Regions:
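Phosphate-binding site recognition
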Residues: 61-322
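Ca2+-coordinating acidic residues in Ca2+-binding motifs
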Residues: 8, 45, 242
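Major-groove DNA-recognition helix of helix-turn-helix-type DNA-binding domains
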Residues: 14-40
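Polyanion-binding surface elements
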Residues: 1-19
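Short, structured motif recognition centered on aromatic/hydrophobic residues
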Residues: 4, 38-44
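Intrinsically disordered, charged low-complexity linkers and terminal tails
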Residues: 2-3, 23-26, 61
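A short, Lys/Arg-enriched interface patch at domain edges and termini
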Residues: 43-62
Length: 322
């Protein structure tokens, strides 16, 4: 039988050598044996499902040193193939083990929030392209089939409000509705989907043609998720990146109440008691008071910079920059 050392297994599986030896000692790796004080492991052994992956270890060994860092890059497919990407895909595993209905991640600027949300979009979204190729060499893929089964399973609604920094509510509203219209257009198959009713198709046409009325936009997440659910026979994942940017801008420029009112209606329709919602993700810098914007959203789980859960997936750990 061809054997490999603990160090070789560490490189292959993306975990520390110490973790490999601990797993061997605990009998977690079938066929592992100690010879002359060193662990020998079958070369065809699979990484145990409970092995903790040292995020970034895979890329440090596998990625050429000359690749640039993905500074300012928020496109996961681009960052993970053309740049020196630190593997954060175990965030998906941690989420799937708990499956909260709606998760809010609050982190400072430049902590990789948008890149992580795009990673979630690429992983979960059902598309014509086989997007599994962006994960087969990542830590999440080594965790087993029960996690792989979620890849490419859901229709996804993705909105990022990170650039909505306008001086008036009128300009902000126009920017927000344009982003919503662009996301509707991304799902162009819905325009003539036989699974959707005429009322939904009429709303779809008003939003993509603009201008629709404010009621259409406030209920746009609920409408789009319902249409996607019917079209794909599968509930939708909703991802809202930098949800609080328009609200912060409203506070600075004097239209806070208008921004909060619109966002409250938008989120309530899409994330509260929505039968067409599989699960939702939001990111932001601040947690705006629940009473002002997340009123009645009892299924919201907040993960802040002070929480240990998910803390290794935003920014970099000491090991990752060592």
């Amino acid at each position: 039988m061809v054997m490999m050392s603990a160090k070789e297994a560490s490189t292959l599986w993306g975990i520390s050598t110490r973790r490999v030896t601990t797993l061997c000692s605990a009998g977690k790796i079938p066929g592992a044996s100690k010879e002359n004080g060193s662990w020998q492991i079958p070369a065809n052994a699979e990484k145990p499902a409970d092995a903790r992956v040292r995020t970034g270890a895979y890329k440090k060994s596998a990625m050429p040193a000359h690749l640039p860092l993905p500074v300012g890059i928020s496109d996961y497919r681009l960052a993970s193939t053309e740049y020196y990407y630190v593997d954060k895909t175990l965030m998906i595993k941690d989420f799937l083990e708990q499956r909260p209905m709606v998760s809010l991640f609050t982190r400072p600027r430049r902590f990789g929030k948008t890149l992580n949300m795009d990673m979630l979009r690429v992983f979960f979204e059902k598309t014509e392209e086989d997007t599994s190729k962006y994960f087969t060499n990542k830590a999440i893929w080594a965790c087993g089939q029960k996690y792989r089964d979620y890849q490419g399973k859901y229709p996804v609604i993705f909105l990022t409000f990170k650039d909505v920094k306008r001086n008036t509510w009128e300009e902000t509203y126009a920017h927000l509705t344009r982003l919503i219209g662009e996301e509707y257009l991304r799902h162009a198959d819905l325009a003539d989907s036989p699974a959707c009713n005429d009322f939904e198709k009429a709303v779809y046409q008003r939003i993509v043609s603009s201008p629709a009325d404010s009621t259409d936009y406030i209920s746009s997440l609920k409408t789009l998720s319902s249409m996607l659910h019917k079209h794909y026979n599968c509930p939708a994942v909703i991802i809202i990146d930098e949800y609080d940017t328009p609200i912060q801008q409203g506070h600075l420029m004097g239209f806070y109440d208008d921004a909060v009112s619109f966002m409250r209606g938008l989120f309530s329709g899409g994330l509260k008691d929505n039968r067409s919602l599989a699960f939702g993700f939001l990111t932001g810098i601040l947690r705006v008071a629940k009473e002002s914007i997340f009123s009645g959203l009892n299924n919201l789980v907040v993960n802040s910079v002070l929480d240990k859960k998910y803390n290794t997936y935003f920014g970099f750990t000491a090991d990752e920059v060592a």
